[in-house]
Regions:
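Short, glycine/charged-enriched hinge/interface segments at domain edges or termini
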Residues: 2-134
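Short glycine/threonine-rich loop/turn motifs
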Residues: 107, 134-235
Length: 235
């Protein structure tokens, strides 16, 4: 177990020859797949884990490990420890972001022709990770308004992440990517090989590298999208 865990994991007592690790807090679970395969190919011992890059809750089981025979040579265990090095095979990274802003864009929503149903969806998803929405606005499709609102959210309202909804396609009226770019944010990716959610944008703003995300409309109505894959990793 020593080669597996970091400080965010609790170790179970030995039961039926097996030891399990559980999450000591909510966070993102990560697995070093190459070194895990090394251990499991060594013979006479095994480690089974849940998938890496997945969000977990406090108390969730992360892995189980045991030796296959009744006994094993101490030298073999030591050899595996030396091959794996000092870094644990598994990491549980606590979420750092606690405050977010939601900026809903679109002329029809701004003028009240249709109801903003995007913001409630995001508030519910953020609540699953104990992230508070400290600032929310409904904005017209004008890049200068969206740019100003992003800066206000971060510099005045204390948002540690900004979510911009709508206006993410290549239509002339969809100006959210331009608005994000005009803040001076560093664009990491515009477009993702994921469906639903191909028109996703990820950027980071300012010295503190505050995440600013552009979310396509599918996030509003699809149960699982690129946002659900990316959010735990951004947090």
């Amino acid at each position: 177990c020593d080669i597996c865990k970091n400080t965010m994991m609790d170790e179970s007592p030995v039961k039926e020859g097996k030891i399990e690790l559980a999450a000591a807090a909510d966070g993102l679970f990560k697995v070093d797949g190459a070194r895990l395969r090394l251990v499991n190919s060594f013979g006479q011992m095994m480690i089974a884990t849940r998938h890496g890059n997945t969000p977990v809750k406090k108390g969730d089981k992360l892995c189980g490990t045991r030796i296959i025979p009744l006994v094993i040579e101490k030298e073999k265990m030591q050899r595996v420890r030396e091959l794996c090095g000092d870094e644990p095979l598994l990491q549980l990274l606590p979420y750092k972001i606690k405050k977010a802003a939601v900026l809903a864009t679109g002329s029809e929503v701004f003028r009240g022709r249709i109801k903003d149903t995007f913001t409630p969806v995001l508030e519910e998803k953020l609540a699953e990770f104990n992230v508070e929405v400290v600032y929310k606005q409904v904005l017209d499709d004008k890049p200068e308004q969206i740019t100003a609102a992003i800066k206000t959210a971060i510099e005045e309202k204390g948002a540690e992440m900004v979510l911009c909804t709508g206006g993410m396609s290549v239509d002339p009226d969809d100006r959210t990517p331009l608005a994000i770019k005009n803040t001076g944010a560093r664009i990491v990716s515009y477009g993702a090989p994921v469906l639903p959610g191909a028109m996703f944008l990820l950027s980071y703003y300012g010295e503190k590298q505050v995440p600013v995300l552009g979310l396509p409309g599918c996030v509003m109505y699809a149960k699982r999208t690129i946002f659900d894959l990316g959010l735990p990793r951004v947090l």
